[in-house]
């Protein structure tokens, strides 16, 4: 297999994504059963963080350890990345010493530049534009709880941010209808809306957007780097809080997701995460299993897979 990267969901085919989801579920079952599976002995993951994280670092580092490999944490404070070394130089050097690299950063162009000059697979662990690893976990979670998401209705409530953008790509790749309920001025990128107009629509009224929905998803009102806008956003997004009563408008089998961290009393009511229709804890854990499946796929030519 030629060198592959995972910068957005569009880098993989529909079949590849569906296979990844199923493999992630298999890996979850194996881990829960206490099965030891270590295909990455002698392999190293480089983890480049320019944005702080809880779930991303723990899931990648733990996943690499469970696979028998090693993970190295790199922050701008610890490397030449924070001292002005060109990205293309860093990409060449770091990729010569590790087997795979994940990057959590701000501008999406940074991961694109890294991928261009890297000799090993690059994983986008979050940029301001996209968050594809979270979508793998979300699709795995829906698959485990409700089966195929194809032809289902998904409702995104809130900011048209990087998570929303990745859900738009997922709607196309996995074949579901996505409704976006966002305040005026906070809609998704217009180019993405045009590109995915066949499967994505804007619905002004959040109650209408939730009607008959199979999955309702939201995220924080102000993402990392937008803290100065918090008060303004709180006023604009107040009508878009997700509550159990909003889920009552949806399909009886609806599930609720949030990539976390969540701000109870803001984008969700205080009781939303504990609602029986919430699957956020499985969703959070599945970052581990989905990313293990992803790394296994990207390095499959370098490891010995089970027969």
Swiss-Prot record:
Keywords linked to the UniProt accession: Amino-acid biosynthesis, Arginine biosynthesis, Cytoplasm, Transferase
InterPro entries: Asp/Orn_carbamoyltranf_P-bd, Asp/Orn_carbamoylTrfase, Asp/Orn_carbamoylTrfase_sf, Asp_carbamoyltransf_Asp/Orn-bd, Orn/put_carbamltrans, OTCase_ArgI
Annotated catalysed reactions: carbamoyl phosphate + L-ornithine = L-citrulline + phosphate + H(+)
SUPFAM superfamilies linked to this entry: Aspartate/ornithine carbamoyltransferase
Any one GO molecular-function label of the UniProt entry: amino acid binding
GO cellular component, one term: cytoplasm
GO terms classed as biological process: arginine biosynthetic process via ornithine; citrulline biosynthetic process; L-arginine biosynthetic process
EC number, UniProt record: 2.1.3.3
Pathway assignment: Amino-acid biosynthesis; L-arginine biosynthesis; L-arginine from L-ornithine and carbamoyl phosphate: step 1/3
Keyword 4Fe-4S (UniProt): no
Pfam families: OTCace, OTCace_N
Binding site for L-ornithine: 162, 219, 223-224
Residues reported in the UniProt entry to bind carbamoyl phosphate: 53-56, 80, 104, 131-134, 259-260, 287
Keyword Amino-acid biosynthesis in annotation: yes
Cellular location(s): Cytoplasm
Gene3D superfamilies: Aspartate/ornithine carbamoyltransferase
Family: Belongs to the aspartate/ornithine carbamoyltransferase superfamily. OTCase family.
Protein function: Reversibly catalyzes the transfer of the carbamoyl group from carbamoyl phosphate (CP) to the N(epsilon) atom of ornithine (ORN) to produce L-citrulline.
Protein's UniProt name: Ornithine carbamoyltransferase
Annotated organism of origin: Psychrobacter arcticus (strain DSM 17307 / VKM B-2377 / 273-4)
Protein encoded by which gene: argF
């Amino acid at each position: 297999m030629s060198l592959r990267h995972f910068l957005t969901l569009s880098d993989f085919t529909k079949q590849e994504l569906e296979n990844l989801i199923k493999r992630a579920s298999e890996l979850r079952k194996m881990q829960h059963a206490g099965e030891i599976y270590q295909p990455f002995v002698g392999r190293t993951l480089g983890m480049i963080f320019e944005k702080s994280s809880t779930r991303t670092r723990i899931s990648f580092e733990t996943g690499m350890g469970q696979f028998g490999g090693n993970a190295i944490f790199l922050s701008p404070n610890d490397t030449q990345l924070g001292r002005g070394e060109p990205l293309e130089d860093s990409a060449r050097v770091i990729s010569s010493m590790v087997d795979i690299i994940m990057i959590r950063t701000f501008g999406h162009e940074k991961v694109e530049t890294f991928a261009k000059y890297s000799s090993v697979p690059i994983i986008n662990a979050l940029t301001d534009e996209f968050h594809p690893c979270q979508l793998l976990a979300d699709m795995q979670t829906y698959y485990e709880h409700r089966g195929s998401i194809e032809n289902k209705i998904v409702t995104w409530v809130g900011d048209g941010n990087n998570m929303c953008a990745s859900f738009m790509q997922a709607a196309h790749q996995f074949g579901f209808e996505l409704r976006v309920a966002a305040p005026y001025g906070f809609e998704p990128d217009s180019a993405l809306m045009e590109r995915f107009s066949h499967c994505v629509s804007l619905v002004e009224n959040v109650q209408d957007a939730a009607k008959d929905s199979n999955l309702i998803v939201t995220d924080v009102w102000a993402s990392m780097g937008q803290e100065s806008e918090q008060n303004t956003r709180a006023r604009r997004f107040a009508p878009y809080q997700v509550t159990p009563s909003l889920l009552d408008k949806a399909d009886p089998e609806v599930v609720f997701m949030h990539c976390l961290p969540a701000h109870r009393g803001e984008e969700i009511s205080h009781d939303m995460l504990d609602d029986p229709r919430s699957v956020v804890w499985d969703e959070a854990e599945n970052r581990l299993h989905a990313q293990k499946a992803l790394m296994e796929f990207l390095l499959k030519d370098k490891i010995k897979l089970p027969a």
